[in-house]
Amino acid sequence: MKYDTSELCDIYQEDVNVVEPLFSNFGGRSSFGGQIITVKCFEDNGLLYDLLEQNGRGRVLLVDGGGSVRRALVDAELARLATQNEWEGLVIYGAVRQVDDLEELDIGIQAIAAIPVGAAGEGIGESDVRVNFGGVTFFSGDHLYADNTGIILSEDPLDIE
């Protein structure tokens, strides 16, 4: 499904929170949306592998990587896993790598930056926790919509039709 965050903001102005414009699109989908699962991890993506092995239809993985751009939390292998398991998108408050491969995949990926250095894979982090970045507090179960213009958040799903 295609989302227009500008239009959604016009219609649902009182119901959405707008994330500060920190992110760029690195995935093959220009827009995506779904119910979020939150993750907090710093320069370690082991937990992301576990979560992205689950069916992701209708879901977006939202990762608070502490804003670190020293190590990439998502690479082509991890993004391929997410695509195979039908995740709608990934929002990474951190970095990604292998961006030429990422843009070929049918998944939305928003992140702060790209860097060639990979993350550790120890599995250190927590999921389903409250995270805060970009001026917005995120909870698992909230609904996120993203496109090349921005990212918005709603407690409830927005009627897109």
From Swiss-Prot:
Keyword Lyase carried by entry: no
One of the GO biological process terms: negative regulation of RNA catabolic process
Acetylation recorded as keyword: no
A Gene Ontology term for the protein's cellular component: cytosol
Molecular functions (GO terms): endoribonuclease inhibitor activity; enzyme binding
UniProt xrefs under Pfam families: RraA-like
Keyword field: Cytoplasm
Record localization: Cytoplasm
Superkingdom of this protein's organism: Bacteria
Record-linked InterPro entries: RraA, RraA/RraA-like, RraA/RraA-like_sf, RraA_gpbac
Principal location: cytoplasm
Function: Globally modulates RNA abundance by binding to RNase E (Rne) and regulating its endonucleolytic activity. Can modulate Rne action in a substrate-dependent manner by altering the composition of the degradosome. Modulates RNA-binding and helicase activities of the degradosome.
Family from the record: Belongs to the RraA family.
Binding partners and assembly: Homotrimer. Binds to both RNA-binding sites in the C-terminal region of Rne and to RhlB.
Name of the protein in its database record: Regulator of ribonuclease activity A
Lineage: Bacteria, Pseudomonadati, Pseudomonadota, Gammaproteobacteria, Enterobacterales
